[in-house]
């Protein structure tokens, strides 16, 4: 319930503030002031990941990746699906991270938390979780910023207001210019968390990390505050909430006029024929 989640958030925030090596993160700011990053065109990459390899992904994920690629091509972007066979082509990940992944001290989801910020730091571009459905009309320019995400604060309903993000961002859709300060600081934060905790303080470590940086560093606070509002909690999760409903063309058109990016889930216990989930899997949306 809301009260216990708020209390839990408070305890985790206190733990993170007390244990994070802030001087390591401050070094990123010193490096940043010494590095003149040339402002060029926004990097045209859409990054995502399926660790076991795309060919081994569930059907739904293969379909969402199909839509991500289609969207990327329309906008002149290259899609890169990171997996265990190609990661070394793009990143040098510290050995202790792999060792913790093998031991199971961190799972693939939290490993991918680190990977998205390393990619944005090194190359820039857009990160989308592999279960994201992107409608062709999604306004990509809201992500072509120094650092961006989906700010979904305009939702009037009170659900999930106990969430640490306070609707300022979503971890499954992030973007940034190459070398952006938020990704660099988050990379430093996550490496510190992975190295110095037997178990990460929370599954949603990205949200606690961004919240921590927001509180501690004015520069990051200002960047996050400048992310334009787009969509609502209800709309972003609409496809997941309605996955078993029978597809209705008028309803879908109404929904995609309001919002054009959706979090879906491949974890459906059964597929209802002609449902939204079924349409997504069959690439008929």
Task: Give the location of each predicted region.
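Glycosyltransferase-associated regions of secretory-pathway enzymes
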Residues: 1-112, 132-285
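Small-residue hinge/turn detector
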Residues: 113-123
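Active-site acidic Asp-centered loop
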Residues: 123, 128-130
């Amino acid at each position: 319930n809301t009260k216990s989640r708020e209390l839990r958030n408070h305890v985790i925030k206190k733990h993170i503030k007390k244990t994070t090596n802030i001087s390591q993160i401050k070094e990123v700011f010193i490096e940043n002031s010494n590095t003149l990053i040339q402002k060029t065109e926004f990097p045209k990459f859409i990054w995502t990941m399926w660790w076991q390899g795309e060919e081994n992904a569930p059907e739904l994920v293969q379909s969402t990746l199909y839509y991500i690629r289609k969207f990327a091509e329309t906008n002149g972007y290259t899609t890169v699906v990171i997996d265990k066979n190609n990661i070394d082509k793009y990143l040098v990940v510290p050995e202790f991270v792999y060792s913790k992944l093998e031991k199971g001290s961190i799972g693939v989801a939290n490993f991918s938390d680190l990977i998205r910020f390393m990619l944005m730091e090194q190359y820039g571009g857009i990160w989308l979780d592999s279960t994201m459905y992107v409608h062709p009309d999604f306004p990509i320019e809201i992500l072509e910023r120094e650092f961006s995400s989906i700010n979904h604060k305009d939702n009037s309903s009170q659900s999930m207001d106990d969430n640490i993000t306070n609707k300022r961002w979503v971890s499954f859709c992030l973007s940034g210019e190459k070398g952006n300060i938020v990704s660099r600081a988050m990379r430093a934060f996550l490496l510190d968390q992975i190295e110095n905790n037997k178990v990460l303080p929370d599954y949603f470590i990205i949200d606690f990390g961004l919240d921590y940086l927001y509180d501690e560093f004015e520069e990051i606070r200002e960047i996050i505050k400048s992310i334009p509002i787009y969509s609502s909690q209800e709309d972003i999760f609409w496809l997941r909430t309605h996955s078993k409903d029978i597809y209705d063309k008028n309803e879908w058109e109404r929904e995609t006029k309001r919002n054009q990016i959706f979090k879906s889930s491949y974890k459906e216990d059964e597929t209802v024929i002609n449902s939204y989930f079924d349409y997504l899997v069959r690439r008929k949306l």
